[in-house]
């Protein structure tokens, strides 16, 4: 006996696809997007908040992929690590943090050195300068004998040539602190790779663990180093790992990684702590005391300064509890976002959850391959739809974000048009399955690629993001077109409750978001329906 085919809800997350009415530097408006344009004209749509307090960040803080996917998947406002750590500094508990003090005590008791490694910017996506300044205060109050700072330059979540201003803040702060030295500088392209391009990680690792200088005899002024690369047309993100002073990592040293976002720090930490490590030749360093701000990867077994909160009953877990099947697909750059982050930090799939990882192109920067792997992601998605077994399919298209980060407008426009073509194919497949297609984004980026001064902008934005609901004629919500209306002032936290509403599944109490669908006078759903209970 043939099983009845499932009419899926397909959630397509267009990473970095924000909304702006401005035309200048707006790759999304400039691009030819007939599919998205038609869907916006034909189907119910609204705009959602994807930044600031509505997604668990400080007021005015731009959103990012981790936060966006966590909020979408959680159906609630989750206090993000940026806020949690900032609050601990404000209420002084940071300075009494047991693990931070233990790292300092290790360096003191063994008369070794303490190393601080992390991204040096105020971008607030992976780290924050305030956290580094607070760490220096802890080390000073504990009288750590030697403190070496290894700075990773940004240029991706900040202006592309802003590193000197951030490093100056640190340099000025430690000017009269003789025990503190800025030891190395490395662009995030090398130190924060997350796509298993181990040659990049090796370059950062080698400088951290070697006393050799790549530029000239040490010590070297950070301004001279950065100007050296600026004059070669190399921006902050791509500064090669360089030593400007003494302070390599040696046996018995303590190390604190102060990035709070895990995905781009895993590889470097892995190279330092994993035994055996087979991705490149490493030094035989022993008795290291390694502390990470957050849980980068449970297999690394490092101490944690800020352990994760337990997050239950995200969308994936809820769907699984009802015995329904679900599917996640993304290319390498965003795979963790539709799995780990979307599931609230759960590394293993839930029962009934299938996953597909599509490899991102092996290029140095994505302006060399603006299509990325969007077409293959679409093929895998359509295949999952056609199986007729999945109630919920979650897809990420990485193009708008990854190309937006390059600052290359022409290539970003090309990537936007590629995604639009893919959405056309996806729309056809969902329509044929009588499913429901939801299109949204996790944060803005590609809609703002020029600053007011006309220079390249590579960072995320605080702009609203689209939410489009496209229903098949026999989908669970009656309407097919303009008969569904949305609440105003929604946020990403309302996406999961909306999906559960369409699936006719009861929202768990942990989900504080609300369904975006209102029972307008045109609404033909059964207003007295009883949600399916667990």
Swiss-Prot record:
Cofactor or coenzyme needed: Mn(2+)
Keyword Amino-acid biosynthesis: no
GO cellular component: chloroplast; cytosol
Isomerase found in the keyword field: yes
Reaction catalysed by this enzyme: (2R)-2-phosphoglycerate = (2R)-3-phosphoglycerate
Positions that bind substrate: 126, 156-157, 188, 194, 261-264, 334
PANTHER family reported in the protein's UniProt record: 2,3-BISPHOSPHOGLYCERATE-INDEPENDENT PHOSPHOGLYCERATE MUTASE
Name of this protein: 2,3-bisphosphoglycerate-independent phosphoglycerate mutase
Species in which this protein is naturally found: Porphyra purpurea (Red seaweed)
Name of encoding gene: gpmI
